[in-house]
Amino acid sequence: MALKELFDRDWQELESEGVLFSTLEKLVAWGRSNSLWPATFGLACCAIEMMSSTDGRNDLSRFGSEVFRASPRQADVMIVAGRLSKKMAPIMRRVYDQMPDPKWVISMGACASSGGMFNNYAVVQNVDHVVPVDVFVPGCPPRPEALIYAVMQLQKKVRGEAYDARGEQLPMVEAWTR
């Protein structure tokens, strides 16, 4: 079929013949959502459950998160698993800032989401005070299936975002560096 003939035909007629119509933005969002590369930021017992989400039984790679990246420059999803001490908060922020845009954060476990049972001066009570969190995973520790569900929810969120929607920056909180 010549290109001129293709443009002269009605789009509904072409759609019935199996021609796909979409915007480039939707196509890019679909590609990004199905190729999330997580960076591990395991801080406590939740990290063990995060690691078991990639074993043969759970197989997180079925959902596009193939390999955990050791370098933040190669990752676009940070999974914060466990409690975050105030001494570790600036380091986590630095790792987050080194990740290329667009980037997302999953807060895994009760300790990362609310401080958990560690209600004291040395623990950040919510990772959201340091980096913007996109998905919270409840549990102590959450099961690997819960993390896989969180990745699937993040994929839905990524599909609905515009290409440059994640460019905002939170200021570094000086209270964590004291």
UniProtKB/Swiss-Prot annotation:
Which compartments does it reside in? Cell membrane
The annotation note on the cofactor reads: Binds 1 [4Fe-4S] cluster.
Under the heading InterPro entries, the entry gives: NADH_UbQ_OxRdtase-like_20kDa (IPR006137), NADH_UQ_OxRdtase_20Kd_su (IPR006138)
Assigned EC number = 7.1.1.-
List the residue ranges forming a coiled coil, or say none.
none
Q: Which cofactor does it need?
A: [4Fe-4S] cluster
Q: What class of enzyme is it?
A: translocase
Q: Name one Pfam family in it.
A: Oxidored_q6
UniProt KW Cell wall biogenesis/degradation keyword: no
A GO BP annotation? electron transport coupled proton transport
- Note the superkingdom of the native organism: Bacteria
Q: Give the principal location in a single coarse category.
A: membrane
Q: Name one GO molecular function term.
A: NADH:ubiquinone reductase (non-electrogenic) activity
Report membrane topology.
Peripheral membrane protein
Note the PANTHER family from the entry.
Answer: NADH DEHYDROGENASE, NADH DEHYDROGENASE [UBIQUINONE] IRON-SULFUR PROTEIN 7, MITOCHONDRIAL
Quaternary state and interactors: NDH-1 is composed of 15 different subunits. Subunits NuoB, C, D, E, F, and G constitute the peripheral sector of the complex.
Q: Which family does it belong to?
A: Belongs to the complex I 20 kDa subunit family.
Name recorded for this polypeptide:
NADH-quinone oxidoreductase subunit B
Q: Which gene encodes it?
A: nuoB
